[in-house]
Design a protein with these regions (language model features):
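Beta-lactam-recognizing serine transpeptidase/beta-lactamase-like catalytic domain environment
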Residues: 1-42, 47-301
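Short, surface-exposed linear patches
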Residues: 16-18, 179-180, 193, 231-233, ...
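Short amphipathic alpha-helical segments
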Residues: 211-218, 312-316, 354
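Outer/extracellular conduits and scaffolds centered on Gram-negative outer-membrane beta-barrels
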Residues: 279, 285, 306-309, 313
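Ligand-recognition elements built from short beta-strands and adjacent flexible loops
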Residues: 299-301, 308-311, 318-410
Length: 410
């Protein structure tokens, strides 16, 4: 379940028509959770590493040189890009495990080259990138898979040349918290009808098993290293900064989180990417507890007004997850259902309607839509009009496009 989401600049019922609120830089009426797509940057490396481990296409102990010539593109790591003469601040040859922890673009490039574009593309599809979650809210963006060329495929390994929504990232990361099983995000957990004395309650909805539990566990171990390794970890603070002592930045009650940091270039309206020193999207995903996460935290900051520091994110993550951990076993049910009976949902006639809109409608009633085919209209439905079903019932929708049967999960 999505427990909380927020964004700034914000819009509320109180300031909806306020001119000053609307004139804030980057103001939008859209939800950044699902109505905005962007190039996510290096947090995508979590999916690449899990995919490479699952397909046995990476040896974590093997070493590589941290510069790659790819056609007319030279892929450097961040420490070489930041130096005036292109020299490395860290060793020029590292292992793939070290490369992940230091967020090496060159290392991820070599992994994709070893996997091949077709295999990497198949894993992106297993994680359902390019596919909306259909959480029941309108205006959801689809994101986009990388173009079918070698450079775009390579760049997608470090989160450029591919676009996602925040909720698509979170859907993919649910597999890290569920032993490889991916869950569809839910924003409504329960619906109570006091007039009828009934309730509908959602349960976990498995929508994929993109990689093995072993691949997930090994990737999470590397993510712990991102936060705890004093040499390679990008969220390990080596010197005092912003009032923080040296050490891991993401901590709950003295225990580390599993972390991946990200920096993404932003596409310019005129083509190419923005060139300013801080014209980036900075981000981090943190999972706690790392061995079997109860909570997944993701935050990004676009073009920060002050000099960028990862502490801007850790200062939000640490107290928030600490508080969530404290109350997770105390949290009362949103609505007491004692004395109520399980409700039913009456199906409508969906034939001729857009499958996406139908899916949103079904999801709002805590049903589980399954779209078959790639068409623009529903031609048949598995549950007839007027039939009553309980919450979480799968409803298959056949479309007028190519009939591709999706994977089915319990």
């Amino acid at each position: 379940d999505i427990l909380a989401t927020t964004q700034r600049p914000t819009i509320t019922a109180d300031n909806f028509n306020d001119k000053a609120a609307r004139e804030q830089p980057y103001f939008t009426e859209n939800s950044m959770l699902y109505q905005s797509q962007f190039e996510p940057g290096s947090v995508m490396k979590t999916f690449l590493m899990a995919s490479a481990l699952d397909s046995n296409k990476v040896d974590l102990n093997a070493s590589y040189y941290r510069r790659v010539n790819l056609y007319d593109v030279v892929i450097n790591d961040w420490d070489a890009n930041e130096s005036e003469d292109g020299t490395f601040k860290l060793p020029s040859t590292v292992t793939f495990a070290e490369g992940f922890m230091m967020s090496s673009n060159a290392g991820m490039t070599r992994i994709v080259q070893n996997m091949g574009s077709d295999l990497w593309d198949s894993y992106l599809r297993r994680f359902k990138f390019g596919v909306p979650t259909r959480i029941g809210m309108g205006g959801e963006q689809f994101g986009a898979l990388p173009d079918d060329n070698p450079v775009s495929q390579i760049q997608s390994s470090f989160g450029q040349g591919i676009s996602t929504t925040q909720i698509q990232l979170l859907r993919g990361w649910t597999s890290f918290a569920n032993k490889g099983e991916m869950l569809e995000p839910h924003v409504v957990s329960k619906i109570v009808d006091k007039d009828k004395n009934t309730y509908l309650e959602s349960r976990a909805e498995v929508v994929g098993r993109p990689v093995s539990e072993d691949a997930i566990n090994k990737t999470k171990e590397l993510m712990v290293g991102v936060n705890t390794d004093p040499t390679w970890g990008t969220s390990y603070l080596t010197v005092e900064s912003q009032g923080h002592e040296p050490g891991p930045l993401f901590m709950v009650n003295g225990k580390t989180m599993a972390v991946k940091t990200g920096t993404a270039q932003i596409a310019a309206d005129t083509g190419g990417y923005m060139k300013g020193m801080q014209d980036n999207i900075y981000s981090a995903v943190a999972m706690y507890p790392p061995e079997n996460p109860d909570f997944i935290f993701y935050m990004n900051i676009k073009i920060p007004a002050s000099t960028w520091s990862l502490t801007y994110i850790s200062d939000v993550a640490n107290p928030l997850i600490t508080r969530a951990e404290q109350i997770k076993n105390q949290e009362a049910s949103p609505q007491d259902t004692s004395g109520l009976k399980a409700g039913k949902v009456t199906l409508e006639d969906y034939e001729g309607k857009a499958p996406g809109n139908v899916s949103d409608s079904l999801r709002r009633n805590l049903l589980a839509p399954i779209v078959i085919g790639q068409g623009t209209k529903v031609t048949k439905q598995s549950v007839a009009k007027g039939q009553e079903v309980g919450a979480n019932t799968p409803v298959m929708l056949l479309t007028d496009g190519d009939h591709i049967m999706p994977d089915m999960f319990k």
